[in-house]
């Protein structure tokens, strides 16, 4: 990139934070060795190329697992809105009148700087790797990541520069302050070429745990073909930038390529495959399983496992994996009547247990998704195990655990006793809302020197006959109280002391970037566009049949043996359309950072996200309000970051023309 700002990002992001790896180690994982300084000549050495290769994987930590990046991909969609404690970063992304998207918003920044830094690293490896004695298979990892990064950029911003200062796709070592954006087709030409080379040269099996393979490259190649086909077809006349012609008649050939590439991987999966149940895909004890093809890795190792950040009090910045904080409401504010019957205690306290963790209350799921007509409507909840394995719906007390200091049990609904480990609060389905007794549960409670009548739960939770747990229906989801995304939550192995300060740090779990299951949905989407309904139905039913199987109910924390695969397949519509594909993608990848790309690709963002319902910010808000978003066609591209424009020495007119049209002053 011919810009001062990107050059500075390059210097800080790569040369001072590079990682070398010992390729000859007996270990099957990357041996990371932090280094304090590099200069560009480092890439002329074998050690430099090795360090660059390791840095390609390390760079994933700087946006995957970052809560602000996740916000740009989820808030403002039909999955998430801003929550009660949200700041302007989240309100801007919602497009509902409480903020605005500008070139200075975090929505604009995304991963722009990190991606271009890594692209330049890839260029350096590709230029110098052969002379340093590296095989085509190793260099193919750089080709893969260059395409990977450009694919994110072209989906987010439209056309972006291929010349970073020394010529097209050349390694740049000098500071330049001008830049020219290439067109979308020109960027995709590079993406396709790089991924096709990666498919050809990468091994079938990873050289180390988590490294790139042929089928990983096929996943992104099939998705790039699919996305470009939609761009060519442009069914809703969404503008692109820089302006260029597009031939809709070519779209079908790219849909076919997407289908064929995905099907090739499905038929010859290599070391990958589907886990037996959806729960096993995302449960912490199965991390790095065969369904996960790429991840931004973390571990409990204090020195290297979190990019050097450690696991004490987290500050909410990369390379920490802190994204789950955003989708976690402050469940610790619930109160309960203690064993003594005259004081309040906190029945569910934060701990390093999957489904809980540190609550920041920045992003809340829209209620519509859980109600009739939504992806998680009651008919889906009844047979689809993905519902249980996506959300924390029941909140178990942890009062008797070491450090909780809240007693062996508390009083629950209907005056019933709840022991430590049992459920204190639950979200129930929409139909059950009609049976909830909303009469406040009150008791005489000590308040300093006084004893006064108070509502027990603080949230004025409801009650159901014969149940000890307090409840709200999904019809009562609010910005303050909502189901947590269980899949991405923290988990640690040192659970004997789960109330330690690690609960306030980043998660030591890897962030899943690519899943083998997506092949089926890419193939299904392409088949719909090709008019091959039977093929589309076959692909989605593989995942739906799996979703009907449950061997562990994580909300009840109990082993089960349930198979509703037949019901899931029977519920598949006879005719598969794009809306059903989007529903399935939401059920499979909810809250993981896929959604904005999915809605933009299919040009369904406005249609599916223009209105939503949710309750208010208060503890007792349970009534849904309808909110309207303004999503103009120009917003299908994000703004070029203001820092990029400020760093360029170009005329005001040239800078204005560099910016995407919807965000010009």
Model regions: which residues?
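Long, intrinsically disordered, low-complexity segments
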Residues: 115, 190, 280-358, 362, ...
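Conserved, well-structured interaction surfaces
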Residues: 46, 50-68, 85-160, 176-214, ...
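Bacterial Sec-dependent N-terminal signal peptides
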Residues: 2-3, 18-47, 147, 191, ...
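Membrane-proximal, proline-rich intrinsically disordered regions
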Residues: 26-72, 644, 648-665
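Short coil/turn linking the two alpha-helices of tandem helical-hairpin repeats
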Residues: 154-161, 206-207, 224-236, 531-532
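Flexible, polar/acidic helix-loop-strand segments at domain edges
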Residues: 361-514
